[in-house]
Amino acid sequence: MTKPNARVKVGNIIFSNEMPLSLIAGPCQMESRDHAFEMAGRIKTMTDQLGIGFVYKSSYDKANRTSLSAARGIGLEKAMAIFSDLKKEFDCPILTDVHTEEQCTIVSSTVDILQIPAFLCRQTDLLVAAAKTGCVVNIKKGQFLAPWDMENVLKKVVHSGNPNVMLCERGTSFGYNRLISDMRSLPILRSFGAPVIFDATHSVQEPGGQGASSGGQRQFVEVLARAAVSVGVAGIFLETHQDPDHAPSDGPNMIKIDDLQRLIETLMEFDDLSKKLN
């Protein structure tokens, strides 16, 4: 029976719960070519200086926005061309979400990691389609699932012939418009054998908390990120923007890009200590 790979290679980066931390970062949604290049360039320069592996993330379509009138992104066709150019310019892998089986084939021709959104993490046909592309698959744990429920989700991808899968913790529903991060989830997810990612920015989201959009508590991103890295993870997922308060989506939980380097430096120190002790 196929098992998940404990080490997942993406370009020159290896995601492993036992190896140094890697970073998945970028703005919530792709806004324009110029904005994508600005964000990727700034993060790439920083991560090269710090010596941490970097995967650029952004969404071409925010398909689960709270309101019908909310901005969703620039669309699949435009985004794929920009992602291709970003890879050539900055030599970094790309992660983006897929929402349908048909998107998996299209996106996998350009992108390195297919991300399964939390709300869709039990959709068998989507998971199988993502698995069959051969791309690395990052599955976000649904806010409605216990960590041990993710073992069966993981098996849907692995038993479809793709052992290169990662599990991402992004918080659990805790009453209305609230999420909580239970750090016990991380060792439980690790026990299934796949690399574990902690999404520190969506974990402070307040889903639908502003009526027509989601709120968030940006001030707690670092607290949760420190805790997760201390427990031990393969990677940290952070959404960032030069002006989060005016971003088209998820602004309240994104961190300012000007604050990113200090945060990553801190997390790398916690990661180094945690993995030495373990």
From Swiss-Prot:
Keyword annotations from UniProtKB, A to Z: Cytoplasm, Lipopolysaccharide biosynthesis, Transferase
Reactions mediated catalytically: D-arabinose 5-phosphate + phosphoenolpyruvate + H2O = 3-deoxy-alpha-D-manno-2-octulosonate-8-phosphate + phosphate
Involved pathway(s): Carbohydrate biosynthesis; 3-deoxy-D-manno-octulosonate biosynthesis; 3-deoxy-D-manno-octulosonate from D-ribulose 5-phosphate: step 2/3; Bacterial outer membrane biogenesis; lipopolysaccharide biosynthesis
Alphabetized SUPFAM superfamilies for the sequence: Aldolase
Keyword Transferase among record annotations: yes
Tree of life domain: Bacteria
EC main group: transferase
UniProt keyword annotation of ATP-binding present: no
Biological process according to GO: keto-3-deoxy-D-manno-octulosonic acid biosynthetic process
GO cellular component terms attached to this protein's record: cytoplasm
Pfam families assigned: DAHP_synth_1
Cell compartments where the protein resides: Cytoplasm
GO MF, one annotated term: 3-deoxy-8-phosphooctulonate synthase activity
EC id: 2.5.1.55
Family that this chain belongs to: Belongs to the KdsA family.
Protein name: 2-dehydro-3-deoxyphosphooctonate aldolase
